[in-house]
Swiss-Prot record:
Its cofactor is Fe(2+). Residues 272-285 have a biased composition (Basic residues). One of its GO terms (molecular function) is metal ion binding. This is RNA demethylase ALKBH5. GO terms for biological process: membraneless organelle assembly; mRNA destabilization; mRNA processing; regulation of mRNA export from nucleus; regulation of mRNA processing; regulation of translation; response to hypoxia; spermatogenesis. Keywords: Dioxygenase, Disulfide bond, Iron, Metal-binding, Nucleus, Oxidoreductase. Residues 18-34, 286-306, 315-343 have a biased composition (Basic and acidic residues). Belongs to the alkB family.
Amino acid sequence: MAGFTDLREKLKSMTPHRDKVFEYSNGEKRKYRESDDDESEYEERRDAEARRVKSGIKQASIFTLEECARIEAKIDEVVAKADKGLYREHTVDRAPLRNKYFFGEGYTYGAQLEKRGPGQERLYSKGEVDDIPDWVHELVIDRLVTHGVIPEGFVNSAVINDYQPGGCIVSHVDPIHIFERPIVSVSFFSDSALCFGCKFLFKPIRVSEPVLHLPVRRGSVTVLSGYAADDITHCIRPQDIKERRAVIILRKTRADAPRLDSNSLSPSIVSPKRRHILKAKRSHRKADPDAAHRPRVLEMDKELQRRSLSSRQRRHDDGSSENSWRRADDREPAARYTHDHAPTRRVKMRRH
């Protein structure tokens, strides 16, 4: 990590020759374009997919600068309340350089369940997250209804994503079995971009060229449906978050969306006592946009070093070395392993 102060710098240094590798949306790879015909075919396929993505996107500039400032002040109030521990347990989800605040409905990511992967996401039980604040209805949702963006009564889930410079969210599709379409988002604090069809990889961290790079301006509304919502992933790249940025995501949950039962939770996050302790510690952490991502990147570097070790060294590992690096977005670090559930494994944690 020496010499790097931001994920964006590490990305740039790790992919100086990325033009030599091209990826199609169906996952096949071709190294080096062998002829003009190959290049033409590649461009045609990329352009065709970009047109399909665009067909499912609508954007509008609805909020004035004054309205943005008022809403941004309310977002700051949400952050302050979360830092004081005033929200319910599952309302707040923290990750390096990105915090999420769930209102109305909250849901687990696949990695928080014993059975992991796409399609395993579940809504929390009713009442597990705080209600949608009145100001979200009055300042945001009602304005979108007035402009015909969404019908009245559509939204029952509001999520605020608060990014610091260099923050990101990996490529994903909003769970189809959880949320109706469209997916509506409103951007605040600064301009950014939404990218479609990226291969977002770690170890080392790198992001491929997107099928479509969609600028999103402060105060703009973005609506995803059809191909853009269901048939291609979208992400926020570290290099596209140059200043603090927040987005309010407004969705409607499906009537038949599955909900959690206690048996579905990973053992490491079941204990109410343990969750209470984590909440108290978490609420007093100070945001440090220059440092919060450093353990994440250092662990990636350590993983590369560990892979170079001989099999003999791995066989004689006494279990006291650090565990393989896990994606920081999967879950809170202190909740990944506990002495109660994994007494023979130990993780060295860094505090800020």
